[in-house]
Every structure is written in structure tokens, then in C-alpha cells.
């Protein structure tokens, strides 16, 4: 099962290449889907709904790391959709706050990748701060819903 997850994440990472012709709304949506898949995998490990797997955890962290480096560029002026993609208008009206949380996300993810968690306790220590940043960002910059 972890091999399938790893292959899926690798394919997702390879599909991240953003070119000038890609629609930023579509790309950011796909990127968040990958981040969400990683969050589910790590969350299930932390809740002990899934056996700890260091390779799967690292794959998820690497997807998050790639997203942390590219995500900010996917919200250019004029790309607000009126909420169709769950991004609140505050992404654009409070860009400084949004960019700060993106920087916090990148810092925490980089630290987690560097830590290379090899057990559940280490994964919890590495992922906890990341999930806190995610929560803050979603509270201020994401429209809640299904």
C-alpha cells in the first residue's frame, strides 16, 4: 500500500511543473489536492489509523516542500474566482499576512524534511507545527465547505 502511495506522490510531484500557460487556479487546486493527500496519510499515521511508514511520511513532506516553494506564485492579481476555488478574497486583500503564513509553512516543512522523522514520535514533532500553520491559513484565507 505504501508503494502505491509513494508512486502516486512521485507522479504528482512530476506533474507540478508550472509553465506560463498553465492556469494558476487549476494548478493551485491540483497542488492543494497533493498537499491534502499527504495530510491524510500523515494524519492517519498520527491517529494510528495507519501503520507508521517513514518513506510515505517523507514523500508527503517532500510534496509539501515543493508546494511551499511554488504556492505563492499561484495567486497572481486577477486570479480571484469569487470563491469557486475556495480561496478567500483576503488572499489578495491581505497579501502580507498570506505571504507570512506561506513563509511559515515553508520554514516548518523544511525543518520537518531535514528532521527525516523515523518514528511516530518524531513525525508528530515535525508535523505538528505544520498542521498549526495550515489551520491558521485555512481560517483566514480559505472558504470552508466540502
Short names for language-model regions:
Residues 13-19:
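N-terminal signal peptide c-region/cleavage motif recognized by signal peptidases
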Residues 21-146:
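Sequence context surrounding c-type heme c attachment/ligation sites in exported
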Residues 2-10:
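Sec-dependent signal peptide recognition
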Residues 1-3, 19-20:
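Domain-scale selection of a single, long terminal region
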Amino acid at each position: 500500500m505504501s508503494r502505491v502511495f509513494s508512486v502516486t506522490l512521485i507522479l504528482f510531484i512530476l506533474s507540478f511543473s508550472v509553465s506560463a500557460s498553465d492556469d494558476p487556479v487549476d494548478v493551485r487546486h491540483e497542488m492543494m489536492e497533493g498537499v491534502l493527500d499527504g495530510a491524510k496519510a500523515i494524519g492517519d499515521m498520527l491517529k494510528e489509523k495507519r501503520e507508521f511508514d517513514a518513506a510515505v511520511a517523507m514523500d508527503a513532506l517532500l510534496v509539501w516542500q515543493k508546494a511551499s516553494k511554488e504556492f505563492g506564485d499561484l495567486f497572481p492579481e486577477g486570479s480571484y474566482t469569487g470563491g469557486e476555488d475556495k480561496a478567500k478574497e483576503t488572499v489578495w486583500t491581505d497579501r502580507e499576512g498570506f505571504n507570512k503564513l506561506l513563509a511559515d509553512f515553508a520554514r516548518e516543512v523544511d525543518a520537518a524534511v531535514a528532521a527525516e522523522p523515523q518514528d511516530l514520535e518524531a513525525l508528530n514533532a515535525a508535523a505538528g507545527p505544520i498542521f498549526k500553520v495550515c489551520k491558521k491559513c485555512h481560517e483566514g484565507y480559505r472558504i470552508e465547505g466540502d
